[in-house]
Amino acid sequence: MNQIDLGGQHAVVTGGAQGIGLAVAKRLHASGASVTLWDLDAGELEKAKAALGGSTGTQTVDITDAEAVVEALKRTEAAGGPVSICVNSAGIAGPNATLDAYDVGWWRKVIDINLNGTFYVNRAVVPGMKARNYGRIVNIASIAGKEGNPNASAYSASKAAVIGLTKSLGKELAGYDIAVNCVTPATAQTRILEQLTPEFIEYMRVRIPRGRFLEVDEAAAMIAWLVSKENSFTTASTFDLSGGRATY
């Protein structure tokens, strides 16, 4: 593992109790950052904290509640100091269904978590980063946001919007020492697969030229550099993690 110095940094990782979020948290912790995990699942948070070590902070928070996000940030900074790194990993896939049959309630839920939640967290952490003239933000989108997956319109739309949000915010903050980027992973071996049909999972796998799914540690390796001081120029950009599937 390449060593990236994140000493003195305080990172918030949403969706940090499992999957890519947990892998990112472990990598940032190993690189010297203090880490606070945000997740809705209190039980999984405790397991993740035990895996990372006693110094890891946790906050049970619903990122679809803008006020709850602000309060969680206050508690996080009171316990661990100013947040200089934010990785938005919380998200859901939603059901597989054609658009004309897609449940409106599910549509709203997917958009609320994947897009609105990412907006609320970014909106909360940005003022402090601007005041300190430093910050690193990575929003986790998806290859589906670039190419669209059939029978996954809500997920594809939400992740495309995260890419747009990232590009807009990165340009807004370009005059500060704040980098805002996103990554677009192909399918990874995480619990999000439990929300999908076997047929849809195979549809995604065969479209990856590497011939396999993304490993969560591979995503964490890229993100660790993006949130480091070494990433001093690149912002408002999208980094591909699709194993060759992306066409642009």
Predicted regions and their residues:
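Short C-terminal tail/terminal secondary-structure segment
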Residues: M1-D5, A93-N96, E147, A224, ...
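The beta1-alpha1 cofactor-binding region of Rossmann-like NAD(H)/NADP(H)-dependent oxidoreductases
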Residues: A42-G43, T60-A72, V104, D217
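Catalytic Tyr-X3-Lys loop
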Residues: S84, D100-F119, Y134, V138, ...
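Substrate-binding pocket helix/loop in short-chain dehydrogenase/reductase
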Residues: A97-L99, D103-I111, L193, F200, ...
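C-terminal substrate-recognition "lid" of short-chain dehydrogenase/reductases
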Residues: F119, Y134, I178, R212-L241, ...
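Active-site helix of classical SDR
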Residues: N122, S158, T166
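Alpha-helical segment proximal to the catalytic Tyr-Lys
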Residues: P127, K171-G175, S232
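Residue(s) in the substrate-gating loop at a strand-loop-helix junction
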Residues: S142
